[in-house]
UniProtKB/Swiss-Prot annotation:
Family as reported in the entry's similarity comment: Belongs to the TRAFAC class translation factor GTPase superfamily. Classic translation factor GTPase family. EF-Tu/EF-1A subfamily.
Stretches for region G1: 14-21
Documented EC number(s): 3.6.5.-
Name of the featured protein: Elongation factor 1-alpha
Record's catalysed reaction(s): GTP + H2O = GDP + phosphate + H(+)
GO cellular component, one term: cytosol
Enzyme class: hydrolase
Biological process annotations from GO: actin filament bundle assembly; response to alkaline pH; response to bacterium; response to reactive oxygen species; translation; translational elongation
Role, per record: Translation elongation factor that catalyzes the GTP-dependent binding of aminoacyl-tRNA (aa-tRNA) to the A-site of ribosomes during the elongation phase of protein synthesis. Base pairing between the mRNA codon and the aa-tRNA anticodon promotes GTP hydrolysis, releasing the aa-tRNA from EEF1A1 and allowing its accommodation into the ribosome. The growing protein chain is subsequently transferred from the P-site peptidyl tRNA to the A-site aa-tRNA, extending it by one amino acid through ribosome-catalyzed peptide bond formation.
Chain's gene name: eef1a1
Location of region: G3: 91-94
Positions of region (G2): 70-74
Length: 453
C-alpha cells in the first residue's frame, strides 16, 4: 500500500440544460466506483423506458431520485479517481436544496467545475444576466471555492460542430464574467468537451486538433492540492446525539477543523459544558485520533443526552474553545426574496448544523458584491435590500447559537438564509461578539427543547 491519494471535493455548477448530469455521469461511469453489473442494469432500464438518449445522465438521475427520497446513497456512485486524486462530487445542482447544501454542506468544495453549453442560443441563455450560471459561480466564489475548471460542453452539436471560433468566443465571454466575480481566468482551464461522445473527457479528441490544452480529467488532476485545516483548533458541529446502552452519550458530527482524540477535554457551545472524551470511533472502529473530513462518534463522560443536541459545536477546552455567539456581522447577498428586506427581518439561518431564527438587527451598509467595498449611501433613509444586493448586516440569534468568522473557521462562518421554504440569501460571517461567560440564562437557554426541522 503506497500513500493514499488525496481526497478532493468538487461541485458541478452551470445552467439547467448545460449537460451537467451527462458530463458528471460520464466521469463516474468511466473512472468511478460503479459496479459494471449495476451499469448494465441501469442501461437496460433506460432502454426499456426509451431513454437511451440519456446516455450517462441516468447515473445522476438515479442518484437524484434516491436523494430526493431520502435514501442513503451508495456513496461509491458519487466518487471517481484520477492518477493523483480521489474525487467526490459533493453536490450537483438541479437538486432542490442545492444552494442550501452548497452552503451548509458537510464539506467545502475544493474546485468548481462550471459546465457551459456551446450551441447557439443555449450559451447565450445560460449566461444571461438572470441565468443560473452567474449565480452559481458567484456563490462558489463567495463560499471560498477558489479553483475553477470550465467545461465547454456539447461541442459535437450541429451548430457548434467542434468550431474553434465558437470555443474562442465562449472563452472570451466566460473569462470576462468570472473575472468580474473574482476568479483569475488565466488560472482557469477551459476544456472543450462532449459529455455525450466523450471528446476531451478522458482522451484527447481527434475532432479538435486545434485544441492544445488538457482533457477534463487532466485538468482535474492539475488542481492545486488544498491545505487541510488540521492545524487549527478543533470544531465539530454536532449532527446528532445518541444514547447508547452500556456506553453512554455519543455525539456525532464531522470534524471540520483540528483533531479530536481520546483523553481530550471538550467544550460544547453554546451550552458551555466541558467533559472528557472517552473514545472516538468511525465506522464502528475505535480511532487514536480523527482529522478534518472524518465523520465520527465520540463517547463523553457525565453529560446527559438532554444537555447537548444537534446544532451545538464541540471544541478543545484548552485551545480556543467554542463559545456562545451574542451577535455577529456578516456580508449577506440577497438571491431571491420577493420583496424588500428591512432591519428587523427575522428569517431562519442554516449555519453548519444549526437551524435558528436570527434577526437582522441592523443593515449597516450596502457593499459591492464582488469587492466588498462600501457603496455610498443615498440620503439618510434606512438601508433596504432587494434581490442582487449585498450588504454588511448585524445579526442577533433568537436563541443560543455558536458560529465563527469565515476566515477563522470557514464551515462555521457561512450560512443560508431560509424563508418561504427557499434560500433567499447567503452570508459569510466577518466578525462575532462572544457572550461573556457566566451571564444568567446560559445554562437554561442551552437546555431549552429544540424544535425539530
Amino acid at each position: 500500500m503506497g500513500k493514499e491519494k488525496t481526497h478532493i471535493n468538487i461541485v458541478v455548477i452551470g445552467h439547467v440544460d448545460a449537460g451537467k448530469s451527462t458530463t458528471t455521469g460520464h466521469l463516474i461511469y468511466k473512472c468511478g466506483g460503479i459496479d459494471k453489473r449495476v451499469i448494465e442494469k441501469y442501461e437496460k432500464e433506460a432502454s426499456e423506458m426509451g431513454k437511451q438518449s440519456f446516455k450517462y445522465a441516468w447515473v445522476m438521475d438515479k442518484l437524484k431520485a434516491e436523494r430526493e427520497r431520502g435514501i442513503t446513497i451508495d456513496i461509491a456512485l458519487w466518487k471517481f479517481e484520477t492518477s493523483k486524486y480521489y474525487f467526490t462530487i459533493i453536490d450537483a445542482p438541479g437538486h432542490r436544496d442545492f444552494i442550501k447544501n452548497m452552503i451548509t454542506g458537510t464539506s467545502q468544495a475544493d474546485c468548481a467545475v462550471l459546465v457551459i453549453a456551446s450551441p447557439t442560443g443555449e450559451f447565450e441563455a445560460g449566461i444571461a444576466k438572470n441565468g443560473q450560471t452567474r449565480e452559481h459561480a458567484l456563490l462558489a466564489y463567495t463560499l471560498g471555492v477558489k479553483q475553477m475548471i470550465v467545461a465547454i460542453n456539447k461541442m459535437d452539436e450541429k451548430s457548434t460542430n467542434y468550431s474553434q471560433a465558437r470555443y474562442d468566443e465562449i472563452v472570451k465571454e466566460v473569462s470576462s464574467f468570472i473575472k468580474k466575480i473574482g476568479y483569475n481566468p488565466e488560472k482557469v482551464a477551459f476544456v472543450p468537451i462532449s459529455g455525450w461522445n466523450g471528446d476531451n473527457m478522458l482522451e484527447r479528441s481527434d475532432k479538435m486538433e486545434w485544441y492544445k490544452g488538457p482533457t477534463l480529467l487532466e485538468a482535474l488532476d492539475a488542481i492545486v492540492e488544498p491545505k487541510r485545516p488540521h492545524d487549527k483548533p478543533l470544531r465539530i458541529p454536532l449532527q446528532d446525539v445518541y444514547k447508547i446502552g452500556g456506553i453512554g452519550t455519543v455525539p456525532v458530527g464531522r470534524v471540520e477543523t483540528g483533531i479530536i482524540k481520546p483523553g481530550m477535554v471538550v467544550t460544547f457551545a453554546p451550552a458551555g459544558l466541558s467533559t472528557e472524551v472517552k473514545s472516538v470511533e468511525m465506522h464502528h472502529e475505535q480511532l487514536p485520533e480523527a482529522r478534518p473530513g472524518d465523520n465520527v462518534g465520540f463517547n463523553v463522560k457525565n453529560v446527559s443526552v438532554k444537555e447537548i443536541k444537534r446544532g451545538m459545536v464541540a471544541g478543545d477546552s484548552k485551545n480556543d474553545p467554542p463559545q456562545e455567539t451574542e451577535k455577529f456581522v456578516a456580508q449577506v447577498i440577497v438571491l431571491n426574496h420577493p420583496g424588500q428586506i428591512h432591519a428587523g427581518y427575522s428569517p431562519v439561518l442554516d449555519c453548519h448544523t444549526a437551524h435558528i431564527a436570527c434577526k437582522f438587527t441592523e443593515i449597516v451598509d450596502k457593499v459591492d458584491r464582488r469587492t466588498g467595498a462600501v457603496v455610498a449611501k443615498e440620503g439618510t433613509a434606512a438601508v433596504v435590500l432587494k434581490n442582487g444586493d449585498a450588504a454588511m448586516v448585524e445579526l442577533t440569534p433568537s436563541r443560543p447559537m455558536c458560529v465563527e468568522s469565515f476566515t477563522e473557521y470557514p464551515p462555521l462562518g457561512r450560512f443560508a438564509v431560509r424563508d418561504m421554504r427557499q434560500t433567499v440569501a447567503v452570508g459569510v460571517i466577518k466578525s462575532t461578539v462572544k457572550k461573556a461567560p457566566g451571564k444568567a440564562g446560559d445554562k437554561k437557554g442551552a437546555a431549552a427543547p429544540s424544535k425539530k426541522k
